[in-house]
């Protein structure tokens, strides 16, 4: 039973050390205790041999401890001596082991420590972000180094940290290897200089809210961090300045159609009462000296009164026509002549109505002479107290009337 345990322990130990040092250990034990029997040597040396086997794997100290656990002092000294010899032979025969067996574990722990140090540096930089870059309490390349060594799994957790320093933002390319971060430092320094002129809220996926405030979107932080900083600024400025102007346009478009219909009807009635045509209104708008407003066609005014224009055009035309209507009514109340408001309304000749007695006299003159001379027309106009032009036009119209009557009678 003891031999099986010894064999199992020797098989677990190094092969060279077992083959070279088993015999000297047994001879040392036999020389230390000559009176002991041969079968007692394995039983007495079993603790020391086991300790020597352990010393071959773990060091000379283990061999010494195994020797002290023996029942006799001589066997203990022999075990310690054997342990020292096996340690020396192991160092001479075995190749040199690596300097750090747990290198991977140390690198992961170092990366975590550097990540925590980077967060501490960033928190310190919050109080100094208004200083120029040469007054920064830390070197930019150190920040790039620590940020590049952060593993990819920490991107989601670290995206919610409000990093405000430009150099810390420029080092978000954490997917690069540790040995290649020196090649990217000029580009990252350039990004840091550009980001100094931007708001801290533009970084890490900051977006403008509906009320103009800056809100952070951690879910899109890795994607937004790789964007051009100027693109982020343009995007944030578009959100910050586009919303108020859009709301202003919406307030102008939000007009009640019933108000437009009521104004169009009132405008039409007032225009007819003033005796102004639609064409006169369109041409008179240029005289109001409204910026960007010229004369309009008669069809535009007609479509406005009949509500056939588009909603936006109705809204744009309403204040212009309202301004003209106020000026026209003011001129009508004050009995002032403002031809620019009516634009040639007084140039239009009114229809002449001839009374019955003058009409019968003209018909008598026409029966005698259908084509009177110019002197005869002047004498008739002076006799009937009419204008010469009125008498001339009446004779011309009467001749056309006679032609139509003869043509219809001949058919």
Curated annotation (Swiss-Prot):
The keyword Nucleus applies. A motif (Nuclear speckle targeting signal) lies at residues 173-187. It comes from the Eukaryota. It is found in: Nucleus; Nucleus speckle; Cytoplasm. Residues 172-186 have a biased composition (Basic residues). One of its GO terms (biological process) is cellular response to insulin stimulus. PROSITE patterns: HOMEOBOX_1, HOMEOBOX_2, POU_1, POU_2, POU_3. Residues 347-406 bind DNA. Residues 31-52, 154-168 have a biased composition (Low complexity). Residues 240-411 are annotated as: Required for DNA-binding and transcriptional repression. GO terms for cellular component: cytoplasm; euchromatin; nuclear speck; nucleus; transcription regulator complex. Keywords: Activator, Apoptosis, Cytoplasm, Developmental protein, Differentiation, DNA-binding, Homeobox, Nucleus, Repressor, Transcription, Transcription regulation. Residues 93-239 are annotated as: Required for transcriptional activation. A motif (POU-IV box) lies at residues 112-121. CDD domains: homeodomain (cd00086). Expressed in retinal ganglion cells (RGCs). Expressed in mature osteoclasts. Expressed in cells of layers of the superior colliculus and the adjacent periaqueductal gray (at protein level). Expressed in the brain, peripheral sensory nervous system and retina. Expressed in the optical, intermediate, and deep gray areas of the superior colliculus, the dorsal column of the mesencephalic and pontine central gray, and the lateral interpeduncular nucleus of the brain. Expressed predominantly in postmitotic, terminally differentiated neurons. Expressed in ganglion cell layer (GCL) of the retina. Disruption phenotype: Mice develop to adulthood and are fertile. Show a reduction in the number of retinal ganglion cells (RGC) and a thinner optic nerve compared to wild-type mice. Show RGC axon pathfinding alterations along the central visual pathways. Show an alteration in the expression levels for several genes involved in the differentiation of RGCs. Display an increase in DLX1 and DLX2 mRNA expression in the embryonic retina, especially in the ganglion cell layer. Tissue-specific DNA-binding transcription factor involved in the development and differentiation of target cells. Functions either as activator or repressor by modulating the rate of target gene transcription through RNA polymerase II enzyme in a promoter-dependent manner. Binds to the consensus octamer motif 5'-AT[A/T]A[T/A]T[A/T]A-3' of promoter of target genes. Plays a fundamental role in the gene regulatory network essential for retinal ganglion cell (RGC) differentiation. Belongs to the POU transcription factor family. Class-4 subfamily. This is POU domain, class 4, transcription factor 2.
């Amino acid at each position: 039973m003891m031999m099986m345990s010894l064999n199992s322990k020797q098989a677990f130990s190094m092969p060279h050390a077992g083959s070279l040092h088993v015999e000297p250990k047994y001879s040392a034990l036999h020389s230390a205790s000559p009176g002991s029997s041969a079968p007692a040597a394995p039983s007495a040396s079993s603790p020391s041999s086991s300790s020597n086997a352990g010393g071959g794997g773990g060091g000379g100290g283990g061999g010494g401890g195994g020797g002290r656990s023996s029942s006799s002092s001589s066997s203990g000294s022999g075990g310690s001596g054997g342990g020292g010899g096996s340690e020396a032979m192991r160092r001479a025969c075995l190749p040199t082991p690596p300097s750090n067996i747990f290198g991977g574990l140390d690198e992961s722990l170092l990366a975590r420590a550097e990540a925590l140090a980077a967060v501490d540096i960033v928190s310190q930089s919050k109080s100094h972000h208004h200083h120029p870059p040469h007054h920064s309490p830390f070197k930019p390349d150190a920040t790039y180094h620590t940020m590049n060594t952060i593993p990819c799994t920490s991107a989601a957790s670290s995206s919610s940290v409000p990093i405000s320093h430009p150099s810390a933002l420029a080092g978000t390319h954490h997917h690069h290897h540790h040995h290649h971060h020196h090649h990217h430092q000029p580009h990252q320094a350039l990004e840091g200089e550009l980001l100094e002129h931007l708001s801290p809220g533009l970084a890490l996926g900051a977006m403008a809210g509906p009320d103009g405030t800056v809100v952070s979107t951690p879910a899109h932080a890795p994607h937004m961090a790789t964007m051009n900083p100027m693109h982020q600024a343009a995007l944030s400025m578009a959100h910050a300045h586009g919303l108020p102007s859009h709301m202003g346009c919406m307030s102008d478009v939000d007009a009640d159609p019933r108000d437009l219909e009521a104004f169009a009807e009132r405008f039409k009635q007032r225009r007819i009462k003033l005796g102004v045509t639609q064409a006169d209104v369109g041409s008179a708008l240029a005289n109001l000296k409204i910026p960007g407003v010229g004369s309009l066609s008669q069809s535009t005014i007609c479509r406005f009164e009949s509500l056939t224009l588009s909603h936006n055009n109705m809204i744009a035309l309403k204040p212009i026509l309202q301004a003209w209507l106020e000026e026209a009514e003011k001129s009508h109340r004050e009995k002032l002549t403002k031809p620019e408001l009516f634009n040639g309304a007084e140039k239009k000749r009114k229809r002449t109505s001839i009374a019955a007695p003058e009409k019968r006299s003209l018909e008598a003159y026409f029966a005698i002479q259908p084509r009177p001379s110019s002197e005869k027309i002047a004498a008739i106009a002076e006799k009937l107290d009419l204008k010469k032009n009125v008498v001339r036009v009446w004779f011309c119209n009467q001749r056309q009337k006679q032609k139509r009557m003869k043509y219809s009678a001949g058919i």
